[in-house]
Amino acid sequence: MGVSGLQRRLFWLLVVGFCRMISASAIVFADEPASSNASSSALQTATSLQQEPDAASPPPKIKWEYYAFVDVGYLLDFNHPANHLFRDRSTTFKVDELDLNMAAAGAKKLPSENSRWGMEFAVQAGKDSKNFGFSATAANVSGADALRHFGLADISYLAPLGKGLTIQAGLFNSLIGYDSLYAKDNFTYTRPWGGDYTPYLMFGVNASYPFSKKITATVFVINDYFHLAHPNSVPSFGGQFADLAATRITFKETVLYGPHQANTALEFWRFFSDSILEWKKDRLTLAFEYQVGTEKVDLPGTPRALWMSAQLPAHRVVHGPWSVTARPEIAWDRDGRWTGSAQLIKALTTTLEYRFPYRKTNTIARLEYRLDDSRGAGGGFFRGAEISPGIFALTPTQHLLILGLIFGFDSQ
């Protein structure tokens, strides 16, 4: 039996084990009152909002948080490409093999009124740290192979101005996008197309100000659309408006404007918009994200490139540690400027998740099915054996069965 056969057998053994875990835990949680789930979800929603300190209580202690996690996954591709690649992807791009997709460790301290300086620092390794942050149309920054191992590296300061102006500088989490680079922070194991082609991290400086409990505005200056790309030496600029319109609804609009090619004339600057609407109630979360980008390309005739994407994830905590997610999405790269291939992609991802928190650890197991369909001049996914050196057949449809296992530690 070859290596691929052993890996596939291992995958199915893991799936069987996952299913046995389902049946065993179903007995444990059968008598659990549903109200506990609602209370847990309500608590999670409440803690995501800024809480007013009690004037009579002593000031909170200064706390550092330490965390680490490992993320292992297997993507079974029914096309079985010989190169083991999920085409045009920067995360979870290896199929038909068991991979360490991410391992990371970090520490952070958030700024507060009694300790105004904050810091975040994290290092990472794994398949998902290999290709993210790079551009399909621009050169890499010097030392990119080492810099990709930094997940966060920033300092922040809460200035005593009005309601509190927070300034952050360094390598910080992107203000664009609904999904994180880390699968543990998302509803699904694999990221949407719009997530892989927008920045997961930003390098630069940002300043945010809460005008009220519901409205926060942020402005930022960053080195480039992708922090590990270096098309030129001119920074990009942007801003975000966040509105907690109601108790259950959040709206965010983020725009970015800057050059992403060697010619930095204003007519060639890229404009990008990311709009997110999220609704939460008890154990149910619904979200809608729409992205659109455009720029003139410095080529004969100065053609205008256009791309857009949208996703509609729905997440439901079913019972106890069990939850399900469905995410339909669409991505259109008219000119191949965004993904590197001119294509229209439609995808559907469904996920079954089990979480097992124990003391300061959390284990997440996900079983996921994903269907992608790519049409167009540059569309398609790899299939089968190599036709000739470096050449593989393409097919418009790809079916994936995915098993992901994430184990994490958090000092909080």
Where are the language model's segments positioned?
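N-terminal secretory signal peptides that target proteins for export/translocation
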Residues: 1-10
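N-terminal periplasmic/intermembrane-space "pro-region" immediately following the signal or transit peptide
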Residues: 18, 22-87, 95, 404, ...
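Short loop/turn motifs that connect adjacent beta-strands in outer-membrane beta-barrel proteins
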Residues: 51-66, 79, 111-119, 160-165, ...
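Transmembrane beta-barrel domains of outer membrane proteins
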Residues: 57, 106-110, 156-158, 166, ...
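Surface-exposed coil loops of outer-membrane beta-barrel proteins
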Residues: 77-97, 128-242, 252-259
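Outer-membrane beta-barrel pore domains
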Residues: 89-92, 129-132, 138-146, 245, ...
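Glycine- and aromatic-enriched membrane insertion/assembly motifs of diderm outer-membrane
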Residues: 92-128, 307, 312-324
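Solvent-exposed loop/turn segments connecting transmembrane beta-strands
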Residues: 97, 113-114, 127, 197-202, ...
